[in-house]
């Protein structure tokens, strides 16, 4: 082959191939025709043209087994339907290595395409069947080992009779070439839940609603193959004749080294081979037409546009097959070249990663044009005319550019390169030519500098990407170590040392940031993983220690299988464990709080139940304000609600009972008012002889008594009964006072009797003297009269005895006193004085004795009344416990009054003890003035006391 023909005839440029990313495999933009008769190096590009790989494999190298996905990858299988799960189909074996003769790819393609056109695109040959045998016709009727069957639910599955395996996916043996292309496409069509189709890329994990262009091209190519018949036999023979002239020159370009030859027997006729070749050309032309219909660019030598009809290539191959009808002798290198002529080439110009070689050029099938034909087809010399000087100058510059005159060339060097061209004479003057040449040099130098700058920039970017993506590069890698590793590589030496250092520093910063981010992500991932493991470990509690947790983690299979988790930072693991323990402690505390709340709720419900139990007792009349715990304990203790109260903190059952009774007592004043209103409405008055049953009968006769407490009713009854008793005592006191007044009047009557009553007098003897007296009539009972008379006689006798004793003492004193007196005084006068003094003493003594007796009686009566008051106060305090506050105030007032009364009584007694001396009467008469005064004072005092008692009540 001539150098440069691949770039000039529409093949893929080498620079374009190098600009493509090497990481892409044949699965991105192209699909292998596996299962067909094409060689393993044949590929169909996205635009439908048959292309070949530039690298030539060794005849003995191992090719990928036929029927397998390129690059050792299996085709993406659709989601397995529900129901029967078929076994996975293992990779199928390739053809035997002894069956790799150097057969021309054109004959193989012709046989394959002829079979496809005649059989209406039947499925490709099953894997394991040699394509050379099929081309020779030795196994033309070979039966596939896969059979098609129907499942009970109507779905189709496929069974392998040799491996005894079944699969839902259609095997490559039964697929047509178009179906194989579609199956190798990474884009698959699926249905959403709503039935709308969408497309998913199994390699990039991308999904979209619109149909990808790659899938559309493959479907268009499938339709082209199915349609068929685009090239007729006449067109095919015309192409064969046109190729015969260049047959010899093509053969010379195959290989210069002699290799062993192999004879291939032909079992097909020339017409069959021609028809097969026509089918191949038709398929390629239709695919190219479909690709050109999708693009708007014109056919050029770039990657985006490919020649529409590569007839010279195909016709030459077909002509070779027709001429060598009986036997064909081909060298080993030519076999390898022809095996690679039908390689599927992607529009991006990707190079197969299996070979690892970067060829210098990418040639298409059109590179087989003979050199002689190319020289003959060169155009003859033309004559140029220029209308203006600018056009002539532009033509001269184009000449320099076409001849690729460098920017540093001298004028003499440039003349040698362009002087033979007619456009050299475009400018007549030499100065104009030199001027145009200098302008061309400036422009070319500028363009070269710009191109060098862009290439250098691209080299720096490539170097930066190389360092960033290299697996051995880290943020701690030294520059010297990197120079040792990459110093011999072109990407390292493509830039200067200064720029290399700057880029290296930037790469280290980028890698450091990247590593930090990765470490952060790894730390976060390990944190989450450890947290999940701790959450799922039931034996880790809030009281678990770190050492115990470590042992639990080592026994955990999830932790033991995760190497990254085992390499986790110990401090991070400890912090994660600490947070987990804190969460468990918080949960435990919350659980305790919930338990405490539940316990408190239970205790509260127990208290409420016991309160309801007390209400029930109150409704039945068993519990009232006067009830005691000891009385009701047998009844209360027999209830379960009392048992539930035992042992719980807070208020006990006794406390609740006391509170309940106190509440009932607090209602006493209000209920007492209601009771008084009821008694007032009924006109009932509580007397001393009123019974509690009568009182309750009167109270319960109205509806207002339903809310009254039985204890409060009893307390009200006791209060009213005490008031009735107080009234009765007051009445008795009043009668006693009246009786005392009558007695004092009777005694006065006896004292004032004339003649005076003697000490030895008898009541029956003197009774008749007082019958008509009012004092005698006031006392109706004779027995009382006798009693008063006896008392009077007893007092009279006592006074007489006291008087005689005083007279004796007085006589002795008077004698002594009489001796001291003056003798001038007469004896008669002294006698009169003595008698007069004696009378006075007798009166004073009788008066003082009566006063003492009366004061003693009054004091005794006062003490009795005071004792009675104290007893009544005690009774009131015992019975009227709710009125304790008011009673205390009343007691204070009464005490104050009593103290005042005591003071007044003491003053009166002191007055009685020292009475004024009065002018007396005769000693023989009764002196009753002193006794009368004492009785009056006593009477006044009694009246004041009675008035005070009435006021208090």
Curated annotation (Swiss-Prot):
Basic residues compositional bias, start-end: 803-824, 863-878
Domain of life: Eukaryota
PROSITE patterns from the UniProt entry: FF, WW_DOMAIN_1, WW_DOMAIN_2
Residue(s) carrying Phosphothreonine: 341, 369, 928
Biological process terms in GO annotation: cell migration; cytoskeleton organization; mRNA cis splicing, via spliceosome; regulation of cell shape; regulation of cytokinesis
Gene3D superfamilies, alphabetized: 2.20.70.10, FF domain
Key word Electron transport present: no
GO cellular component: nuclear matrix; nuclear speck; nucleus
Listed Basic and acidic residues bias regions: 879-912
Residues in WW domain copies: 140-173, 181-214
Modified residues (Phosphoserine): 34, 151, 719, 783, 879, 881, 884, 929, 931, 934
Region spans: Disordered: 1-40, 348-382, 799-953
Pfam families named among the record's database cross-references: FF (PF01846), FF_PRPF40A (PF25432), WW (PF00397)
Domain FF as annotated: residue spans: 389-443, 456-510, 523-583, 603-663, 668-723, 738-795
Disulfide bonds: none
Keywords carried by this UniProt record: Acetylation, Isopeptide bond, Methylation, mRNA processing, mRNA splicing, Nucleus, Phosphoprotein, Repeat, Ubl conjugation
GO molecular function: proline-rich region binding
Residues with PTM N6-acetyllysine: 196
Domain notes: The WW domains are essential for localization to nuclear speckles.
Function field: Binds to WASL/N-WASP and suppresses its translocation from the nucleus to the cytoplasm, thereby inhibiting its cytoplasmic function. Plays a role in the regulation of cell morphology and cytoskeletal organization. Required in the control of cell shape and migration. May play a role in cytokinesis. May be involved in pre-mRNA splicing.
Family assignment from sequence similarity: Belongs to the PRPF40 family.
Name of the protein this chain belongs to: Pre-mRNA-processing factor 40 homolog A
Gene: Prpf40a
């Amino acid at each position: 082959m001539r150098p440069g023909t691949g770039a000039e005839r529409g093949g893929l440029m080498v620079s374009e191939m190098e600009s493509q990313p090497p990481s892409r495999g044949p699965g991105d933009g192209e699909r292998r025709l596996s299962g067909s008769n094409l060689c393993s190096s044949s590929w169909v590009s996205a635009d439908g043209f048959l292309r070949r790989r530039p690298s030539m494999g060794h005849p003995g190298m191992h090719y990928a087994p036929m029927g397998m996905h390129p690059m050792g990858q299996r085709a993406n299988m659709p989601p397995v339907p529900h129901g029967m799960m078929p076994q996975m189909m293992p990779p199928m074996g390739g053809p035997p290595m002894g069956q790799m003769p150097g057969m021309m790819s054109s004959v193989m393609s012709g046989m394959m395409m002829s079979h496809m056109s005649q059989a209406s695109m039947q499925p490709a040959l099953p894997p394991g069947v040699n394509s050379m045998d099929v081309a020779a016709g030795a196994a033309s009727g070979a039966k596939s080992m896969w059979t098609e069957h129907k499942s009970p639910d109507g779905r189709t599955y496929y069974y392998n009779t040799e491996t005894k395996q079944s699969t839902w996916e259609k095997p490559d043996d039964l697929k047509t070439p178009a179906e194989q292309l579609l199956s190798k496409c990474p884009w698959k069509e699926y249905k959403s839940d709503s039935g709308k189709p969408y497309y998913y890329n199994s390699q990039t994990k991308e999904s979209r609603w619109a149909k990808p262009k790659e899938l559309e091209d493959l479907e268009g190519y499938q339709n082209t193959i199915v349609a068929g018949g685009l090239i007729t036999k006449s067109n095919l023979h015309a192409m064969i004749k046109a190729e015969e002239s260049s047959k010899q020159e093509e053969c010379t370009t195959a290989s210069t080294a002699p290799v062993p030859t192999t004879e291939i027997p032909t079992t097909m006729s020339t017409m069959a081979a021609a028809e097969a070749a026509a089918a191949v050309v038709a398929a390629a032309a239709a695919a190219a037409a479909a690709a050109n219909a999708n693009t708007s660019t014109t056919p050029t030598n770039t990657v985006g546009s490919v020649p529409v009809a590569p007839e010279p290539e195909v016709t030459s191959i077909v002509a070779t097959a027709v001429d060598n009808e009986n036997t064909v002798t081909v060298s080993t290198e030519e076999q390898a070249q022809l095996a690679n002529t039908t390689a599927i080439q992607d529009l991006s110009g990707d190079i197969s990663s299996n070979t690892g070689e970067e060829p210098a050029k990418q040639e298409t099938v059109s590179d087989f044009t003979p050199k002689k034909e190319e020289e003959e087809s060169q155009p003859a010399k033309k004559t140029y005319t220029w209308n203006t000087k600018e056009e002539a100058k532009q033509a001269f510059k184009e000449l320099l550019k076409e001849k690729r005159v460098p920017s540093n060339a001298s004028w003499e060097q440039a003349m040698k390169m362009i002087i033979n061209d007619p456009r050299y004479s475009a400018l007549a003057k030499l100065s104009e030519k030199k001027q145009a040449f200098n302008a061309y040099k400036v422009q070319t130098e500028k363009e070269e500098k710009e191109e060098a700058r862009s290439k250098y920039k691209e080299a720096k970017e490539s170097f930066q990407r190389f360092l960033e993506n290299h697996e051995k590069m880290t943020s701690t890698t030294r520059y010297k170590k990197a120079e040792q590793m990459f110093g011999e590589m072109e990407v390292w030496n493509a830039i200067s040392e200064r720029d290399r250092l700057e880029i290296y520093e930037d790469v280290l910063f980028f890698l450091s940031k990247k590593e930090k981010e990765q470490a952060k992500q790894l730390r976060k991932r390990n944190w989450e993983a450890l947290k999940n493991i701790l959450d799922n470990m039931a034996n880790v509690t809030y009281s678990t220690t770190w050492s115990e947790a470590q042992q639990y983690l080592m026994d955990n299979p999830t932790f033991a299988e995760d190497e990254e988790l085992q390499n986790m930072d110990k401090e991070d693991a400890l912090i994660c464990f600490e947070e987990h323990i804190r969460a468990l402690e918080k949960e435990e505390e919350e659980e305790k709080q919930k338990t405490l709340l539940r316990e408190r709720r239970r205790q509260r419900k127990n208290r409420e139940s016991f309160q309801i139990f007390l209400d029930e007792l109150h409704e039945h009349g068993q519990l009232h304000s006067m009830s005691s715990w000891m009385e009701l304990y047998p009844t209360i203790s027999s209830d379960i609600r009392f048992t539930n109260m035992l042992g719980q903190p807070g208020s006990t059952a006794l406390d609740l009972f006391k509170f309940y009774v106190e509440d009932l007592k607090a209602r006493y004043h209000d209920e007492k008012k209601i009771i008084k209103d009821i008694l007032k409405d009924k006109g009932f008055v509580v007397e001393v002889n009123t019974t509690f049953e009568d009182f309750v009968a009167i109270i319960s006769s109205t509806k207002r008594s339903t809310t009254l407490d039985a204890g409060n009713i009893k307390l009200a009854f006791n209060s009213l009964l005490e008031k009735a008793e107080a009234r009765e005592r007051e009445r008795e006191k009043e009668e006693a006072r009246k009786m005392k007044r009558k007695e004092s009047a009777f005694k006065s009557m006896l004292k004032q009797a004339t003649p005076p009553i003697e000490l030895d007098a008898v009541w029956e003897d003197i009774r008749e003297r007082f019958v008509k007296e009012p004092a005698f009539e006031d006392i109706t009972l004779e027995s009382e009269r006798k009693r008063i008379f006896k008392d009077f006689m007893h007092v009279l006798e006592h006074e007489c005895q006291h008087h005689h004793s005083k007279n004796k003492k007085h006589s002795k004193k008077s004698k002594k006193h009489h001796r001291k007196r003056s003798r001038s005084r007469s004896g008669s006068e002294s006698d009169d004085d003595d008698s007069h003094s004696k009378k006075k003493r007798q009166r004073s003594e009788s008066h003082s004795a009566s006063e003492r007796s009366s004061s003693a009686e009054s004091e005794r009566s006062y003490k009795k009344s005071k004792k009675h008051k104290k007893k009544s106060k005690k009774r009131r305090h015992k019975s009227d416990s709710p009125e304790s506050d008011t009673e205390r105030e009343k007691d204070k007032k009464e005490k104050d009054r009593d103290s005042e009364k005591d003071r007044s009584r003491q003053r009166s007694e002191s007055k009685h003890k020292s009475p004024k001396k009065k002018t007396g009467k005769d000693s023989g008469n009764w002196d009753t003035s002193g006794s009368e005064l004492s009785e009056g004072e006593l009477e006044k005092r009694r009246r004041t006391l009675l008035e005070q008692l009435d006021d208090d009540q």
